[in-house]
Design a protein with these regions (language model features):
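Preference for short coil/turn "hinge" residues that link or interrupt alpha-helices
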Residues: 8, 41, 56, 77, ...
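Claisen-condensing/thiolase-fold acyl-transfer catalytic domains that form or cleave C-C bonds
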Residues: 90-169
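Condensing-enzyme catalytic core mediating Claisen C-C bond formation in acyl metabolism
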Residues: 6-69, 73, 155, 168-169
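Short, well-ordered amphipathic alpha-helical segments that serve as non-catalytic structural scaffolds
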Residues: 66-82, 133-138
């Protein structure tokens, strides 16, 4: 959990307030998790750091550049394992860092931006809660369809990134 500090002028204006949670059970629900990939590249760890009782540090240009390269690669590698082409995915639910990143990932995958649910203009970047808030809104507005793939993708401090493939049941 991240708490904004007023003295963090360089990043405080970037983040909105939000929280999210996800319930995973053995019972049948709206969707099932098919598979996931998670990656770490410590060579970029200084570009996005969050330490206990210290202000967040972020090199925004480097973070967006790395995320716009690494997230599409993670999504592609995950989808290839299941012979799914990116345009055949029902929806992409990403960490809502900024609209530019979402559009760059869509372009890199050759998918219309409309398939990438976005609420960044409504809430801003709510940090680790952003993808869960987006998923909850998308689920209420559109929802999972039986058998249809949905991709979740995010990145964060350390430098970590990953993707998760789900299917509607």
């Amino acid at each position: 959990m991240y708490k904004r500090q007023p003295q963090e002028r360089g990043v405080a204006v970037l983040f909105g307030d939000g929280a999210g949670a996800c319930l995973i059970t053995a019972d049948s629900g709206k969707a099932e998790i098919v598979d996931s990939v998670l990656n770490t590249d410590g060579s970029f760890s200084e570009d996005l750091t969050l330490e206990c009782d210290r202000p967040i540090k972020m090199n925004g240009r480097s973070v967006i550049l790395q995320a716009s390269r690494k997230i599409p690669a993670a999504i592609r590698s995950l989808l290839e394992q299941y012979s799914i082409d990116p345009p055949d995915v029902l929806a992409f639910l990403m960490h809502q860092a900024n609209q530019n990143l979402i559009d760059r990932v869509a372009d890199a995958l050759g998918v219309p931006s409309a398939k990438f649910f976005s609420n960044i203009r409504k809430y801003g970047n709510t940090s680790s809660a952003s993808m869960l808030i987006a998923a909850a809104e998308w689920s209420r507005e559109f929802g999972f369809e039986p058998g249809e793939p949905v991709v979740f993708a995010a990145f964060g401090a350390g430098f970590n990134w990953g993707a998760l493939l789900a299917r509607g049941v």
